[in-house]
Amino acid sequence: MTHLSDLDIANQSTLQPIKDIAASVGISEDALEPYGHYKAKIDINKITPRENKGKVVLVTAMSPTPAGEGKSTVTVGLADAFHELNKNVMVALREPALGPTFGIKGGATGGGYAQVLPMEDINLHFNGDFHAITTANNALSAFIDNHIHQGNELGIDQRRIEWKRVLDMNDRALRHVNVGLGGPTNGVPREDGFNITVASEIMAILCLSRSIKDLKDKISRITIGYTRDRKPVTVADLKVEGALAMILKDAIKPNLVQSIEGTPALVHGGPFANIAHGCNSILATETARDLADIVVTEAGFGSDLGAEKFMDIKAREAGFDPAAVVVVATIRALKMHGGVAKDNLKEENVEAVKAGIVNLERHVNNIKKFGVEPVVAINAFIHDTDAEVEYVKSWAKENNVRIALTEVWEKGGKGGVDLANEVLEVIDQPNSFKPLYELELPLEQKIEKIVTEIYGGSKVTFSSKAQKQLKQFKENGWDNYPVCMAKTQYSFSDDQTLLGAPSGFEITIRELEAKTGAGFIVALTGAIMTMPGLPKKPAALNMDVTDDGHAIGLF
């Protein structure tokens, strides 16, 4: 049986005019800023806040295979299922990054009949937010180098500049570069480097800001580097926070699109969850809560990464409690964690599913530690067998875990009704949500708490560099920030080959980064990179554009 590609399905779908989608959730035309017929930005100042805000349903996942487990697909499909049940619902997603689109992942707007549209636009340049973020980030780099070139009044030590340039592309050759070469007229030579745009602190700030004023305040607090006597230098010292916020004045507005089934969708912001905090913008989520009774959103990768950061960073900053958490599981991921090689994942292997269930179990238990009841969604794939699915259902029953087989890829919203009904039962009950740790704990204790309670590790080792940074950050008054772990998504440990539910391992913190604008401390583990590289055969090899301007190969 031949299945249509995601792009084919998207191209065959009929989109509603964006003003009709807006009207369906009460967005007035004067609050709508159309970008063509099917996309728009929303002027949040023209949205009336409501007292009884919508409930937030978070979608996370077990530790994924390299292909991903369909978390975005389930997120969109669950929202469509609520729509099918006549619930007032919106979906809130992150924007895809170009780098992974051309790399290993392809597009990131859901899949099958559970997609947000127009998928070509969203997966490519969309409404220009990432370009604005890239421009603001690199403008700051230009201001820093110009300040040094023009006499360096602030006494910035060019050996201790923390701020890097960014590009929305996977480009390993740019990780370490030299700038200012070619003589005195070209600036002061120094070492620099590039991160991918989604790792930029500007991206995190945009996603954690509540208003233009908040955006400007957070930008002003960015630490760009240090003086020769190790004093922090901020954007406020350079006096360019206003200019940077001006570049972002449109990017901060949430983007409105729609699912295949006409469910309104806010797609805004896109930090990675393995190297950043992995959640869409607070503004988009809060706007959706003012417009809908239920808001379905996602956080990147597994509960150890995106969901933990959603709870400890985003929800804490925004001041809301998630009403329910869906944990996406797939039979292929369970088999991978049960020891099956990538090439054999399509073959039935119930014993491997049994062996791999420990990974799902830990993710389920992680959610419970935040005081929220999890619901497992088995995201169906065509190679799953009845015996494999039945084992997972029986495991859930034995462990009193809510579970539903989800077929939204094939059936759209109708394939997610069972999941929606399970979630409805959870959100109607009170929960006892609380973050994992108190902000008053010392940084090293917050890190140890994440490693031991969420990852299952036994010990945290800090490199000599990280130990010095802990001391320096405490002296600078940064000890009360939440922690954003930078770690592989494939394992609970910092070794991506250690699958299943390992325990007793040590995690090494090799370096810390102070994101004083965004308001968190990044702890880098293992070999995690903030500028990815492309694989040997990138997805770009299968992409093209037709003579009439339509994309080919965006999955």
Swiss-Prot record:
NCBIfam families to which the protein is assigned, alphabetical: PRK13505.1 (NF010030)
Q: Which UniProt keywords apply?
A: ATP-binding, Ligase, Nucleotide-binding, One-carbon metabolism
Origin, by domain of life?
Answer: Bacteria
Report the EC code(s) recorded for this entry: 6.3.4.3
Please provide the Gene Ontology terms (biological process) for this protein.
tetrahydrofolate interconversion
GO terms (molecular function) for this protein are: ATP binding; formate-tetrahydrofolate ligase activity
The UniProt entry, under PROSITE patterns, shows: FTHFS_1 (PS00721), FTHFS_2 (PS00722)
Family named by the database record: Belongs to the formate--tetrahydrofolate ligase family.
Write down what this protein is called: Formate--tetrahydrofolate ligase
The record's section on Pfam families has:
FTHFS (PF01268)
| Residues binding ATP | 65-72
